[in-house]
């Protein structure tokens, strides 16, 4: 699944004390890609089918978020405030002033949070299948098949359970190669990765029980007022964040969305299912005046 090595550079930068791995490719206006969560997630595995096309038009930055991929793992906490701060520190560390941002799942929450905190620095954003934003807007949904598969991997990290996680993420099972499974499995079981998962679980538990933390997490009163040009993309076959329970209600709560794109044959990682259509929709939106 690897991209041709002549199309990108894999680099590290010190983002306010956090050694952060990122991929950079192309030239032009900067686009920051923010991957979602789950075992073995990284900038490359989240966006490898999209970076080469986006890099034909933009300078693309795909970071490994703190606690993921080859980026450092925090010692004591890994929740949304830490992830949001790390994203802001990364943008500063690579000296970007104004950016386009694209985020998937909990990465889309990070993008929206960055846009709320720094609205003058985000020119446009693309939010892809984000149950995290749905939760921040007060929406609820039943435990999903994808989340159950992820919990099974957390308790029993095997290659078979990694395959089940990936089958929950995408609709096109042909894209789940042995190489992809092995690569994500190695990232998910490296030193520090399991600790990161435990830190995230601890944060989610606190989020359920601490009203003050939930208030900090909430976007209910701020996100609907955001006027940064934004589109949302959702897969009709999403098994992590079902479109009927989260996507359509979220669309109706955000009056300033430029568009809500439904991909009929995509799961949670739309960008890795209907790849050509996704790339075209995103490029057209970002290039439009």
What are these regions (language model features)?
Residues 52, 62-102, 279-283:
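Active-site loop/oxyanion-hole signature of alpha/beta-hydrolase fold enzymes
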Residues 116, 123-164:
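Flexible "cap/lid" loop of the alpha/beta hydrolase fold
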Residues 220-266:
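Conserved loop-alpha-helix segment in the C-terminal half of the alpha/beta-hydrolase fold
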Residues 157-222:
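Conserved alpha/beta-hydrolase catalytic His-Asp/Glu region
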Residues 18-70:
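Conserved HGGG/HGGXW glycine-rich cap/lid loop of the alpha/beta-hydrolase fold
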Residues 2-19:
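N-terminal cap/lid segment of alpha/beta-hydrolase-fold proteins
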Residues 256-289:
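Catalytic active-site module of serine/aspartate enzymes centered on a nucleophile-bearing elbow/loop
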Residues 103, 107, 111:
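Gly/Ala-rich beta-loop-alpha elbow adjacent to hydrolase catalytic centers
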